């Protein structure tokens, strides 16, 4: 109702009969003359069709082209971009999770009706997620958390149960609640390895910056708030309050942004990539980027010292491989800039797999697995038994691998997925 009507165009062609028998312009010829004159064309020479507005029609609120044109008329100043295959920067109205970009959110105060965009884009995205799950469900309502391959670090590529929105996002909790127990007297156990790739990163950093690693190993250390503090995004008082349990929306959001920045920067993301992935301005992304590399300078040294081997494939093309001293495997290296990401992600996957192997030896069944997280279904009353199993298994991983940083796991119980992750 608030979007402006949009023009519907038609092509007007030069008429076949421009003139009457007496040499004057025909009715069609006169229309062509007037049309050419309005566009600055010479009617005697212009042969191509001319696009004109035939009528004005109601807008399509799902058309991103129309939405962007409307926002531009409202003096929209985009601050979040994507890049198309040609390398062009495309301004984003909404982020991957369906929420509005900050530049559009900032316009809501002046144009309150824009709030409808937030609801519309999120709901459309969430309906798509649920529809895909319904299509994949069997006759009894079960879906399979399927795998359709591996990454170069041997991590599963997932399908079916993918793009499940975070509980922090609109309707995320409701969608996660769709994954539930089979019987009333059962509970789900969700367990993931605590800050897995951050801990494996610390394992490698120990030989370069042990004092920083010791700081990270303190009981109340929060790597994401530490990064935010070093960037000046939060105060020491705010960090202390958060650690004491006062999780204000402002600090929670800052921590969320710096958590994403922590992981993205570890694997070579630049300012533009950070801006796009986190849905923040380039200025905010730049602060995160500078703060990260000030604290984590050793990551570049670790990458430079990695063991690299070049091998010719069957086409006699050079393939580069990186040796992982923890798994004792060589991993395909896509590009030289991916040295640390390949090393650290490969280590994380290996540690997780060793943990899973230990669990399966004692309890040969998993309900689901996503990245560094597993889900078990068990009877009520057996929670402590399951907790002991998971903790003992991660302890066995520590004894076996002897990393410079001990691994651990977080454990939660609940009736559905929204309660456990």
Regions found by a protein language model. Give the residues of each.
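Polymerase palm active-site segment centered on the conserved acidic dipeptide of motif C
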Residues: 1-20, 290-307, 381-421
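Acidic, glycine-rich two-metal-ion catalytic cores of nucleic acid-processing enzymes
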Residues: 2-247, 305-373, 388-396
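Alpha-helix N-cap/N′ positions at the starts of helices
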Residues: 62, 252-257
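Catalytic palm subdomain of template-directed nucleic-acid polymerases
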Residues: 201, 270-280, 374-391
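Short, amphipathic alpha-helical "recognition" segments used to contact nucleic acids or chromatin
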Residues: 256-267
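Helix-rich, typically C-terminal accessory recognition domains appended to large enzymatic cores
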Residues: 269, 273-274, 353, 409
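Short, basic interhelical loop/turn and adjoining N-cap
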Residues: 278-288
């Amino acid at each position: 109702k608030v979007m402006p009507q949009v023009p519907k165009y038609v092509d007007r062609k030069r008429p076949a009969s421009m003139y009457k028998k007496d040499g004057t312009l025909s009715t069609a010829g006169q229309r062509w003359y007037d049309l050419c004159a309005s566009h600055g064309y010479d009617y005697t020479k212009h042969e191509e069709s001319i696009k004109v507005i035939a009528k004005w029609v109601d807008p399509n609120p799902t058309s991103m082209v129309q939405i962007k044109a409307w926002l531009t008329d409202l003096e929209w100043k985009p601050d979040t971009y994507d890049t198309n295959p040609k390398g062009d920067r495309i301004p984003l109205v909404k982020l991957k999770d369906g929420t509005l970009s900050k530049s559009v959110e900032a316009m809501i105060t002046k144009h309150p009706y824009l709030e409808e965009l937030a609801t519309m884009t999120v709901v459309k995205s969430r309906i798509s997620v649920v529809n895909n799950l319904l299509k994949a469900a069997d006759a009894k309502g079960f879906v399979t958390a399927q795998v359709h391959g591996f990454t170069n670090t041997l991590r599963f590529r997932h399908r079916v149960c993918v793009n499940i929105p975070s509980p922090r996002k609109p309707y995320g909790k409701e969608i996660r609640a769709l994954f539930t127990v089979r019987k009333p007297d059962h509970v789900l156990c969700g367990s993931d390895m605590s800050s897995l790739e951050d801990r494996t990163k610390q394992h490698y950093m120990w030989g370069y910056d042990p004092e920083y690693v010791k700081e990270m190993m303190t009981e109340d250390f929060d790597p994401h708030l530490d990064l935010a503090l070093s960037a000046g995004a939060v105060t020491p008082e705010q960090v202390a309050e958060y650690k004491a349990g006062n999780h204000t929306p402002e600090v929670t959001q800052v921590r969320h942004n710096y958590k994403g920045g922590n992981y993205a920067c570890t694997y070579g993301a630049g300012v533009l990539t950070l801006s796009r992935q986190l849905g923040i301005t380039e200025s905010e992304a730049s602060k995160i980027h500078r703060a990260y590399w000030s604290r984590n300078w050793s990551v570049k040294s670790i990458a430079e010292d990695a063991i690299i081997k070049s091998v010719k494939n069957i086409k006699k093309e050079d393939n580069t491989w990186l040796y992982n001293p923890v798994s004792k495997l060589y991993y395909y290296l896509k590009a030289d800039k991916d040295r640390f990401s390949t090393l650290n992600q490969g280590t994380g996957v290996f540690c997780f797999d060793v943990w899973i192997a230990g669990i399966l030896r004692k309890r040969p069944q998993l309900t689901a697995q996503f990245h560094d997280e597993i889900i078990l279904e068990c009877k009520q009353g057996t929670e402590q038994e399951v907790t002991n199993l998971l903790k003992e298994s991660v302890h066995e991983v520590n004894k076996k691998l002897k990393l410079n940083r001990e691994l651990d796991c977080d454990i939660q119980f609940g009736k559905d997925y929204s309660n456990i992750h």
